[in-house]
Amino acid sequence: MSILTSPRGKVEVVHCRRTESQDIFCIKNLVRKFTQKLFGRLNIIYLLEKANLAVTVCNDKEEIMAHSIFLDYPNWNVAKQDNWIPLFRELDKEIPCTPLNTLFMHFFVAVDEYATGCLKEIIRTVFKAVPELYFIFLIVPTYLSLGSTLITVFDQVGNIPCLNYNEDFAVHICHRHNHYPQLHIRKARVEDHDDLMPIFMHYDNTLKEIYGEYFLAELIEAQDKDHHAVVCEVEGKAVGFMSVCTSVNLPLLHECFDLGPFHGFCTPHPDDILKPSREPSLEEGEEKHLKKCSTSLIIREMQIKTTLRFHLTPVRMAKIKNSETETSASCEEALPTVLGLVSEERLKQDMEKNLSILSLVDEEDVASSLSSSLLLSVESSHFRPLYLGDPIAFCIQLFCIDERYEARQVLISNVSLSLDFMSFVFSLFPGKNFCLISVPHLTPEFVLIQNFVKVVPFNNCTLDHDLYVFHRAGLLRSITIRLAKFLDTAGVEKLVSTLLLSTKILDDLAQYNEAGRDPDGTALQVFVAEVADQIVGIAVIRKEMDIEYIRSHYNIEDFIYFSHHQQEEHGRLNHFALNPIFRHYTKFFLKEILRLGYKSCLYYPVYPQTREGKLQSSYSHSLTSALHYLVPVRPRRQIVYPLEKLGINAPSKEVSKDQVSFALNHTNRKLTLEPKVTVNARIVVVGASSVGISFLETLVFCSHLKFNNLTLISTHGLPGKRLLHNEQRKFLASDHCFNDKDYALMSLCSWVNVVVGRMTAIDRAAKQVVVSKSEIVFYDHLILCTGLQYQVPCPTGADTEQHLTNREVLELSKQRYTGTVPSNLFILNDEEDCVRMLCWLRNSSILTEGKVIVYGNTLDAYTTVETLLNIGMKGSGIYFVHPPTESNITCINNNDVESAVEDALSAAGVTVFHDALLAQWNHGQHPDPIYNACFTTSTKPIRLECSAFFSFYKKNVDYETFKAFNDACLVYDGRLVIDTTFHTNDIAIRAAGSLTKFSNRYYSNEWTHSNFSSKEIGFQLAAAMLSLFDPTLEPVTEPPADLDRLIPMYKGAKIQGGILPGSYHYLHISKPAIPTPLNLQRSQPDFGSDVVTGNAKKGTYFRLYINNYKLVEAITCFSKEPFPSSNYIRLFGQHEQVLNNLCTRFDDKLIPDLYSYFTEPWCMALFHDRFIDLKKELRQILISKQEEDKPTMEEIAYRLEEEEINLNEKPQKYLQRVFEDSIYKSLLEKSILDYLHYNQYHLPMYAWPGII
C-alpha cells in the first residue's frame, strides 16, 4: 500500500497487482491520443497475451489508476526480438544490458492527476518483482517529448532507426538504483546492534529469551576465521544480518539427507566408501522375484515421478560411478576449489578448467534407486557412504532482513558495483564450495533460498527442517541462451552423457544442425545455455502439430486467449537438460526459448508408463528438470459423439481422434515472470481412495502453488496402472470418479511421493506415521482417506449337523477373523487384488472344471459373477450366495433391473442362495485351502463344494488401520469421528470419505460421507486446507461455536456402475440421499415423475426421475449395448426444459427410446464441459440490471412468487411475455451464439451466424 497525493491535494491509497483480463475495459478508457503517439495504436488484449509482465495500480476501491506492460524485446520494431542486444550495446557501452537484466516498457496509461506517483509505484513494483532486472528501456518517436510523467523516471541515452520505415526513435532508460535501495554488504560491527535488534524482535523474541538481550552483540564480537557476521546496509543503516560459520554437523546430515550428489560436502578421498558391499541375499531367489514384481506392478508410477523430481529438486546431481576409482576421479573434476574473492573472471576460469561441477543423473539409476528405497518390503539396510575428505561447506546460522528490502536479496544476478550476501560470504571462506541453510518445513519460502537446491531427505529423516544447498559456481551470472550450432556437439555430449535419452537428444541436435527440421517437415529448434564458453544446458523444441487436439482436450484457455496465438507460436518441449548448479536460471532459459524461437507457448507432455514399466512411451520426450517451472493443465471432459449419426456435422478428426492419453504441462510468455508460492509443509495422504486422489488432484492443479512435500501412503501405490487389459470387464463396480485414462491425464506420479505400504501406527506427538510396522513418514498435515474394505468373513461356527437356522445363530459380522486366512479366499478391494486373483485362476483348472462361491450382495459381487462368466467359467460352477441384509434396500434398488439380472443368472446356470450366513469352512477343520463351505439359512443349512471363495460381505475399517487410530487416541465410534471441517480430535489430522462419521453433537448419524460423491468430498477437503497455504485466499474464520451445528450438504451426484450378469451395462446416478426403497419413494406425495423407455429384460431400459421442481434427480441405464456413461452423467441436475421439453415430448409419445433421443445432434451441447459456464453466464444476465428504470427478471420472478403483481394470466406466461419484450432476450441469444461460435470445434453440429 502506498499513499499518492494529487497536485490539488487529493489523497489515494493505492496498491499494485498483476493485470487481470477484466481490467481491459477500464484500461482502454485511460488511453489518450498522446498515448497512441508514444506507443502506437495497440491491441491491448493481444499485447497483454504476449507480455512478460503487466502491472495495474488500483486504489482502495479497486478502481484502476494506472497500467503498464513490459516485454523482453523492444517495441516500434526498432530491432528483431531475437537480436536487439548488439544495437543497444552500441548506444552506451557503459550499460551492460542483457536479456536477463532488461525489460522494455511497451505501454503506460494512468489517471492524469496521479500519473507521476502511479508510474513510480509501478517502476518500484517491477524492480521488486524481478530481482534480476536492472534496466527498463522506453522507446518513443524522436519528435515526441516524454511528457511530464515519463520524464520523471526515464533518461535519454540515444537514438536508433526503425527497421520498417525511415524514422528515428529515442531510447530512454530507467536504472534500478534510482528507484530501489542499493544494498551494501560488509562485515558486521557491534555498532550495528541497535539497527538490527528491532528487525529481529519484529519477527520473534525467542533468541532474546534464550540467549539474553545482547545475544546479537555477542555473536558479532565472537567473529573469527570460522565464524563471520555480515550485514547489508542502506544509506548507512543496517537492514539485514547473516551469521555464517564452518561448524556443520555433517554426520547428522549424512544420516538424514542424501548427500551423495554433493559427495557429502567433502573433498574426494581415495579411501571414501561410496557403495555398500554386495549382499546377494536381497537380489536372489524369492526376494529378487518380489522386487521385480513390485517394481513392475506396484511402484511403476514412482519411476517417472522420481526422475522428474530428481532433476527438478534436483536430488542427485552427480551420477555415482560404478567403481571407487571412477567416483574419485569424477568428484575431483566435479568440485573445483575456488579461492579468493568470487569475481566473475575467476569463476569463468574455474568453469573453463572443469565444467562438471555437478553432472546430470541417469534417469534409470534415479528411478531404480528411489523405487527400491520407497518399496518398504525390500528396502536394503540403511547404508550411508563414508567420506574421509575435508569438509568444504559452511552454513548460515542466522539470517534476517527488513522485509522492505528482502526482494533485493538476489544470489546470482547482481551487476551493480556492490556485492550481495552470497558473493560476500563465499569470499569469507575461500576454501568452501557449498553454503547450507536449514529451514523449518512450515516456514514460507523466502527470497534468499529460492536459488538454493533442496536436498532430498531419507525416508527415516528425523529432522523437522528442510536442507538447502548453494554451490559457489552458482554465482556465475554471465549465462547466455542461443541457438545451437555444430561446434556445440562436443559440449552437449559431455552434458547429457549420463541421461537415458542422450542418444535421442544428440540425434535431434544433429538433425537440427543438418536441416533445421525433422524428415517429416516438422520445424525443429535446439537451444543451448552457455556459461564461460561451456555448454551447461540444452533444450529441444518442435512446432506443436497437435494444437487443435490440445485446445479441445485440455483447459489451455485457463492460461491463454487461444485466438491471439498463431499456429507457429506453439511449441512442444521435447528435451530440457540444465546443469543443476544453474537450476535457478530455468525460468530465464524458458523465457529466452520463447523470445529467440518466436514462440508464445510451450507444452510438455508426460505419457503414462506402459505395463512393461518403461519410463516413458516411445514418444521421445526426455524427463525434464523444468517440470516444476511449468504449470499442469487440467484435462477437459470430452463428449462421446455418435459419429455415424452426426455424419458431416461431426467434429474434425483432430478433435475426435483417440490418442494415447498424456498429462500436459505448459508455460507461456505471461508465466515466465509469474512466481509460484512454494509450500514445504509435509502433507501425507493415507489411502489411494477416490477421496484421496481427488484431494491430491485439487492441490496439484493449483497452478500458482508448488507443493514440494506431497506424499501418498498406499498399499499398492497409485492406481491407474491398466493392469486389466479389457476395460469392459472389471471385477469391481465403478463409482465413475476416476478411471485409468483420468490417471494418465493427471500424472500424479510427477508431483506426489508414493510410499508403498500399510499404515500401522500414528505417533501424534512426533507427527509421524509408521508404515508396515517399521518405516516412518513424518507429517505436518495428515489426511486419512483409507475408506472401507471388504474383510475376511468370520464364520459363525454353527454346527450345521444340528440343522440350525439364522435365528438360532449368533451373527458375527462385526467380529474380526483371527484364524488362518485360506489361500483360495479372495477379498477384492482394488485392481491389484483382481490381478492377483486372475493370475491364480488362470494357473489352475478352476475355470474349466472347478466350482467357486461368491458370497455377498453388493454390486461388486454381481460384477464379479459376470466377469467370471465372461472369462470362461461355466455358470453351473458358480454359487452366488446372498447373506442376510439389515434392511430391505438392495444394492440395485430397482425391481425391473433386479428381475432381469435374476433371469440372466438363471439362464447362465448360476445357482443363487438367499439369506445364507457363513457357518463353517471345511466342517470346522483347518480352513486352508477351502474345499467346502457351510451356511445357515432361514430354513435349513446348505453345504457347497468349492475351489475358490470370493467374499464381498460387508465393508469395514481395516483392523490395522483401526488399531492405529485407537492407539493414537483418535476418537472412534464405529467410524473415525470428524467435525464439519474434516478435523479429527487432532488439529493436524483430517479425515474424509466412508472411513468417517460426523460427531454425535450434530445429531445426524444417518448422514456420512458415504452418502456423497467421493470426488466432491476430496475437492472440498482440499478447498478447506488451501486457505492455509494460498495467500490469494481469504483466511477461513471459524464459525461461532453455537452455529457449528449443521453438517455440510454436498450436491454432486452419487454414481455406481458396472457390467451385471447377462452382460448388461448398468449405470445409476442419484442425488445424495439416505437410501430408501424405490417403491417407497414413489409412494411419497412429493414424488415427481418417472420417464422410462425400453424394457429391462430386453436390455433397453432407461429411466429418468424428474422431481417436482422439474430437475433430473436420478438416472438408471440398463442396456445390452455399451453406452456413453460420461454423457449421461451430465444430465443430472438439468431442468427437463433444457432437455428439449422432455416431459411434454414424453407425454405426447414422441420419445420411444431415450438412448436414441440423447444421441440426437441438438443435445451435444448439454454434454459439453463448458455448458455449466454458459448456464451461469445466462443466469448472471437475468439477475443483473440492464435498464435503469426496469426491474431485473429475477426481481419480477420474486414479485410473482410473493403475489405482489395482480395477473389475469398464468405467471409463467406473464414471465414469458415480459422476457420477450425486454432487452434480456437479445442478450441471452447473443451469449448463446457466442458460446456456440467459441466452441464450434466441439459443437460443429450447431448453426451460428458465421456459417449461415
From Swiss-Prot:
UniProt-listed SUPFAM superfamilies: Acyl-CoA N-acyltransferases (Nat) (SSF55729), FAD/NAD(P)-binding domain (SSF51905)
Pfam families: CFAP61_dimer, CFAP61_N
Domain of life assignment: Eukaryota
Main location: cytoplasm
Key words, A-Z: Cell projection, Cilium, Cytoplasm, Cytoskeleton, Flagellum
Localization (cell): Cytoplasm, Cytoskeleton, Flagellum axoneme
Tissue: Expressed in testis, brain and lung; the expression in testis is higher than that in other organs. Detected in spermatozoa in seminiferous tubules (at protein level). Not detected in the respiratory tract cilia.
Signal peptide extent: none
BP GO terms, sorted: cilium movement; cilium organization; flagellated sperm motility; sperm flagellum assembly; spermatid nucleus elongation
Quaternary structure annotation from Swiss-Prot or TrEMBL: Component of axonemal radial spokes, the protein complexes that link the outer microtubule doublets with the central pair of microtubules. Interacts with CFAP91/MAATS1, ODAD2/ARMC4, RSPH3A, ROPN1, ROPN1L and RSPH9. Interacts with DYNLT1, DYNC1I2 and TUBB3. Interacts with WDR35, IFT22 and IFT81.
Role played: Involved in sperm flagellum assembly. Plays an essential role in the formation of the radial spokes in flagellum axoneme.
Protein name: Cilia- and flagella-associated protein 61
Organism, as annotated: Mus musculus (Mouse)
Taxon lineage: Eukaryota, Metazoa, Chordata, Craniata, Vertebrata
Gene label: Cfap61
